[in-house]
Amino acid sequence: MTPMRKTNPLMKLINHSLIDLPTPSNISAWWNFGSLLGACLIIQTITGLFLAMHYSPDATTAFSSIAHITRDVNYGWMIRHLHANGASMLFICLFLHIGRGLYYGSFTHLETWNIGIILLFMTMMTAFMGYVLPWGQMSFWGATVITNLLSAVPYIGTDLVQWVWGGYSVNSPTLTRFFTLHFMLPFIITALTTLHLLFLHETGSNNPLGIPSHSDKITFHPYYTIKDILGLLLFLLALMTLTLLSPDLLSDPDNYTLANPLSTPPHIKPEWYFLFAYAILRSVPNKLGGVMALMLSILILTTIPALHTSKQQSMTFRPLSQFLYWLLITDLLVLTWIGGQPVSYPFITIGQVASVLYFTTILLLMPTSSLIENYMLKWT
């Protein structure tokens, strides 16, 4: 008799996605981050829902409602810190997931890759809005500085900023709309994640060798379900260690001070996962130019499939490209460090050099190195 999972319309969907899914037999631990991102999304949604039950999106009560959650709600401190550190863990998994896609050439699956970039944008938007909600000093000034960038848009810039703010400054209307969007966006992200998976299962997963693996595939369950559970346990160990032993390690002390429009913090900066883009923004002296560089630092990912000049999909057997790949990763780490430093010499110069190197590596050096490798292997 045919198992129910193969006949029931609902179970058939789950079966084709998680149980009988044909999967390459040689995918490594770098392929674990997709499932970890799914776990992150579930954790963030659940903790976020519990926080929303006690949160008050108003400039006069937001800060005290966070204090109330932390002090008076049962396990409120834990839910709050799980949510804040869960965002950091989500971005770590997200960056590693994108890094794996770049290294092993997963960007050749165009629909999956482009939906992934949209997901990255939406996750960044959601995280930024979430950072504003505690209504501390860094929340307020971060919101003021980042939303002010819209004023760089020609003709409609000023009107656009006031429209986003809901007034002439960041205040209660801004907080209310940010809370609404922060609540709504994760559900759109969940829908897009389903699309991301749908397109991935149309083409099948890539593998470390970057070669077709149709002749050697195994079922997802039990092999990769066990592997994903191990990854999930290690992920939960890291998240709980961070949350229980050092919950404020990745947050800013300024956010424990109530937002004050009359007092500017000495150094305004976003959360650590935005620092690389913030450094690129600051390295351009012109406001509009900076905003464009900021957008391009993420949008450049859409050009990667077009810039792929190698005859090989993966970087596994391409030492020159590997060197440039790790140069790019190092450059991003330097940009992250610079984004957290004050705007003074020598940090300005280092940031500008690192920003130029970031774009040059992706747009020029990597495609050129691929052509050199093709020539050396006589694959021209």
From Swiss-Prot:
This protein's species is Pongo pygmaeus (Bornean orangutan)
Give binding positions for a ubiquinone.
201
Q: What is its main location?
A: mitochondrion
Which GO terms of the molecular function aspect are on file?
Answer: metal ion binding; ubiquinol-cytochrome-c reductase activity
Function, as annotated, reads: Component of the ubiquinol-cytochrome c reductase complex (complex III or cytochrome b-c1 complex) that is part of the mitochondrial respiratory chain. The b-c1 complex mediates electron transfer from ubiquinol to cytochrome c. Contributes to the generation of a proton gradient across the mitochondrial membrane that is then used for ATP synthesis.
Q: Where are the transmembrane segments?
A: 33-53, 77-98, 113-133, 178-198, 226-246, 288-308, 320-340, 347-367
Task: Indicate where this protein resides in the cell.
Answer: Mitochondrion inner membrane
Q: Which GO terms describe its cellular component?
A: mitochondrial inner membrane; respiratory chain complex III
Its protein name is Cytochrome b
Q: How does it sit in the membrane?
A: Multi-pass membrane protein
Q: Required co-factor?
A: heme b
Q: How is the cofactor bound?
A: Binds 2 heme b groups non-covalently.
Q: What else is known?
A: Heme 1 (or BL or b562) is low-potential and absorbs at about 562 nm, and heme 2 (or BH or b566) is high-potential and absorbs at about 566 nm.
Q: Which Pfam families match?
A: Cytochrom_B_C, Cytochrome_B
Q: PANTHER family attached here?
A: CYTOCHROME B
Q: Which family does it belong to?
A: Belongs to the cytochrome b family.
List, in alphabetical order, the GO biological process terms annotated in this UniProt record: mitochondrial electron transport, ubiquinol to cytochrome c
According to the record's subunit comment, the protein's assembly and interactions are: The cytochrome bc1 complex contains 11 subunits: 3 respiratory subunits (MT-CYB, CYC1 and UQCRFS1), 2 core proteins (UQCRC1 and UQCRC2) and 6 low-molecular weight proteins (UQCRH/QCR6, UQCRB/QCR7, UQCRQ/QCR8, UQCR10/QCR9, UQCR11/QCR10 and a cleavage product of UQCRFS1). This cytochrome bc1 complex then forms a dimer.
For this UniProt record, the keywords arranged alphabetically read as follows: Electron transport, Heme, Iron, Membrane, Metal-binding, Mitochondrion, Mitochondrion inner membrane, Respiratory chain, Transmembrane, Transmembrane helix, Transport, Ubiquinone
Residues annotated to bind heme b b566: 97, 196
Q: Where does heme b b562 bind?
A: 83, 182
